[in-house]
């Protein structure tokens, strides 16, 4: 498996910091002997610039790894602690280069960092959880990749559930549209039926009126016939 670029850069940055500490110590020893040190000073200044570039690169790599979930938040915090230590060492080295710091403290800090790289207990590992305690970088990275895969699987399952719910919602919406269409058709049918009933009722009323008129006419005709019969009926 290819090495993690962050840790590769971190290792090279630590080497630069260690080299700067050694060069500063060498320069100070030369100055105590009254020797000129322009070449050493130029070398140290160049190494300090390289150290700053490396630290900025580590910051960018860490930010990208955390934002894209390539590593867990726990691992991100652990790397941030390592990065903070490098930033502190950079300030100490710069102060010592400018003769503003204590050389013994600077060299001791740098050597302690190198011993930590070789296996001396690291103060940030004292509170390390059981899941990662005693594991190497590759093993921790594999564990993180497994966690990320599990998280991705969970997100895929959640996405599938949401998709099914969305599909069910669309189906329910389509069914409601169909029910609304049926209700609209029934409403139109009821309205048409009601109109037909009103029309038939008007026809029945008209027929009733005509029937009543015909009855009156028949009565009148019968009365006329009766009058005529009585008039022509012989009295003897």
Swiss-Prot record:
Ranges facing Cytoplasmic side: 1-215
GO CC annotations on file: early endosome; endomembrane system; endosome; late endosome; late endosome membrane; lysosomal membrane; perinuclear region of cytoplasm; phagocytic vesicle
Keywords associated with the record: Coiled coil, Membrane, Phosphoprotein, Transmembrane, Transmembrane helix, Transport, Ubl conjugation
Ranges for domain t-SNARE coiled-coil homology: 145-207
Coiled coil: 42-65
One GO term (biological process): regulation of protein localization to plasma membrane
PTM comment: Ubiquitinated by HECTD3.
Alphabetized GO MF terms: chloride channel inhibitor activity; SNAP receptor activity; SNARE binding; syntaxin binding; ubiquitin protein ligase binding
Chief location: membrane
Record flagged with keyword Transmembrane: yes
Subcellular location(s) per record: Membrane
Known tissue expression: Widely expressed in all tissues examined.
Gene3D superfamilies named among the record's database cross-references: 1.20.5.110
UniProt cross-references to Pfam families, sorted A to Z: SNARE (PF05739)
Membrane-topology descriptor: Single-pass type IV membrane protein
Superkingdom of the source species: Eukaryota
Protein name: Syntaxin-8
Organism encoding this protein: Rattus norvegicus (Rat)
Lineage: Eukaryota, Metazoa, Chordata, Craniata, Vertebrata
């Amino acid at each position: 498996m290819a090495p993690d670029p962050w840790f590769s850069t971190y290792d090279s940055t630590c080497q630069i910091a260690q080299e700067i500490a050694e060069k500063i110590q060498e320069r100070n020893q030369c100055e105590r002997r009254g020797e000129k040190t322009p070449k050493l000073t130029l070398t140290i200044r160049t190494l300090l610039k390289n150290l700053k570039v490396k630290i900025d690169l580590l910051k960018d790599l860490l930010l990208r790894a955390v934002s894209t979930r390539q590593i867990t938040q726990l691992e991100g915090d652990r790397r941030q602690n390592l990065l903070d230590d490098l930033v502190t060492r950079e300030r100490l080295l710069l102060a010592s280069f400018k003769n503003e710091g204590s050389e013994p403290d600077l060299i001791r800090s740098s050597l302690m960092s190198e011993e930590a790289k070789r296996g001396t207990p690291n103060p940030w590992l004292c509170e390390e959880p059981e899941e990662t305690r005693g594991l190497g970088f590759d093993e921790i990275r594999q564990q993180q990749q497994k966690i990320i895969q599990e998280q991705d699987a969970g997100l895929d399952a959640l996405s599938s559930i949401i998709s099914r719910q969305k599909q069910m919602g669309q189906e329910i919406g389509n069914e409601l549209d169909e029910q609304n269409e049926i209700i609209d058709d029934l409403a139109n049918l009821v309205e048409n039926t009601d109109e037909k009933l009103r029309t038939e009722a008007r026809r029945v009323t008209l027929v009733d009126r005509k029937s009543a008129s015909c009855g009156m006419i028949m009565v009148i005709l019968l009365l006329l016939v009766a009058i005529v019969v009585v008039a022509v009926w012989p009295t003897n």
